[in-house]
Amino acid sequence: MRALVVVNPRATAMSPRERDVLAHALGSETDLEVVETENRGHAAALACRAMRNGTDVVVALGGDGTVNEVINGLLTDGVHDGVPALGVVPAGSTNVFVRALGLPNDPIEATGALLEGLRSDTYRTVSMGMADDRYFCFAAGLGFDAAVVHGVERQRRKGKRSTHVLYARVGVAEFFRGNRRHPRLHVELPDGTRFDDVYFTIVANADPWTFVGNRPLHPTPETSFDDGLGLYGRRRMGVVGMLWSMARLSGDNPRVGRRGAHVLHDLEGLTVIADEPVPFQVDGDALDTRDKVTFRSVPRAIRVVGVPLETG
């Protein structure tokens, strides 16, 4: 079995020594190549090359941004039988994708699950979302949520570490900086339904949307990797209402947090139109501003290697 490990050397949760241990362990099971990324887009290029060269498994070692790039590289030519399986060793700050799948968030435990999955030939085939020409594995957004991602990215370029505290600080600043009086987004569904009162959108391919520490946030709790896309379109931006909803979305009954929002699930697609270009993000990666994005669900897009965590 031929395998490629795509390593983000800037990943925060794994030391060089631990990466060497991972490579040694995988090398005992596969014909292994390990490559470190050098710049933005490099992970996608490496994954695309591996797909076209007939590699069996591509492992993303990094955070959700690295995983997203690898997925886009693997699916450069669309969904087909020759797409390598995806393995993930989480080494970012939040690691939403693996946690939503029920895989270990610890990189050493994740390596063990990956090896066991390869030995036992255990895979799960999951859907992906697509935003225009970009695949995403768990969520994309326009407006406030994307503005927070853009703000955090600006702070990281200044040398700040990506932490939950940083996200909270940027989130508060962006909330009070933004236009909370007039909605700027419009959502169009395939059946002709249109919402014209939306301040920001989260388009989800999985649940949860993200984590605050160990607490998951569930704006679209009925969305899964086995179905279509979920939509959370916020239509009220009052301070009290937002705080109430955010608190409920992390509780035992997240449906209570739907007040003030359009919440839909299992959508084949949708289009979001903005009155003017607004911040846009996919899988926590800040992209250029957009005034229109078309989303669609891509069923059974990719096989993920691993054994889910045992419960009980």
Predicted regions and their residues:
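Catalytic core of DAGKc-family lipid kinases
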Residues: 6, 16, 37, 75-200
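ATP/nucleoside-binding phosphotransfer catalytic cores, i.e., glycine-rich phosphate-binding loops
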Residues: 189-190, 218-226, 233-312
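Glycine-rich phosphate/pyrophosphate-binding beta-alpha loops
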Residues: 141, 145, 202-218, 286
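ATP/NTP phosphate-donor binding region
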Residues: 1-58, 68, 304, 311
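Short glycine/serine/threonine-rich phosphate/pyrophosphate-binding segments
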Residues: 43, 65-70, 96-97, 126
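Short beta-strand/turn micro-motifs composed of small residues
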Residues: 7, 62, 233-235
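Gly/Ser/Thr-rich active-site loops/lids in small-molecule metabolic enzymes
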Residues: 156-166, 208-238
